[in-house]
Amino acid sequence: MSSLREIILDTETTGLDPRQGHRIVEIGAIEMVNKVLTGRNFHFYINPERDMPFEAYRIHGISGEFLKDKPLFHTIADDFLEFISDSKLIIHNAPFDIKFLNHELSLLKRTDIKLLELANTIDTLVMARSIFPGSKYNLDALCKRFKVDNSGRQLHGALKDAALLAEVYVELMGGRQSAFKMVDKSAVINNLATNQVNNKTEQTTIVIKPTKEELQKHKEFLSRILKTAY
């Protein structure tokens, strides 16, 4: 049986439209194999080489001053592309993130880099609209519907929102009991502290039904992401 690798991905930006000069300021991506979080992630804050509009700052709390010493996109592009590889991307409102990522990639002017394809994404916003017509579909509303603890989400954040989306996605696919197995999350937590990408480490997936203890460990893991993502 072949493994299904998926990447839960989110970005934060300086605004709504890259055609108006807006840029990505944070990328958070979490690896899932056969609906199991492996503990591997990619997370970087990025210097957008421009100011931070107050409207965007109010949403994610990332200031221009904070981003001054952060890497430029071109310095992390290869690591990012290696991490996502050709895996399916799970994104909430995928067209938004894909247009920004492709804008950043196009600015590199490299013939060896292909732009990302929207066809290679699963849009959880579209899924939610199909399953729950007439309801609210933002991440907070879906967390509330599925009883996912998002109490630490006062502001948006790419990595912590990707972690929440991972839970929501599993619920949209049928729920924890049918798909969500637990693994050790220490690698993710360590990466949060060091802002490093760990895309070389192989980890063993434990294929079992989640016990109450494992589900509690997952809640604790999610809580730590929400508290330490900034």
Swiss-Prot record:
Top EC class, one word: transferase
UniProt-annotated binding residues for a divalent metal cation 1: D10, E12, D161
Any one Gene Ontology cellular component term annotated for this protein: cytosol
Needed co-factor(s): Mg(2+); Mn(2+)
CDD domains named in the record: DNA_pol_III_epsilon_Ecoli_like
One GO BP: DNA replication proofreading
Reaction catalysed by this enzyme: DNA(n) + a 2'-deoxyribonucleoside 5'-triphosphate = DNA(n+1) + diphosphate
Subunit and partners: DNA polymerase III contains a core (composed of alpha, epsilon and theta chains) that associates with a tau subunit. This core dimerizes to form the POLIII' complex. PolIII' associates with the gamma complex (composed of gamma, delta, delta', psi and chi chains) and with the beta chain to form the complete DNA polymerase III complex.
Biological function: DNA polymerase III is a complex, multichain enzyme responsible for most of the replicative synthesis in bacteria. The epsilon subunit contain the editing function and is a proofreading 3'-5' exonuclease.
Name listed for the protein in its UniProt record: DNA polymerase III subunit epsilon
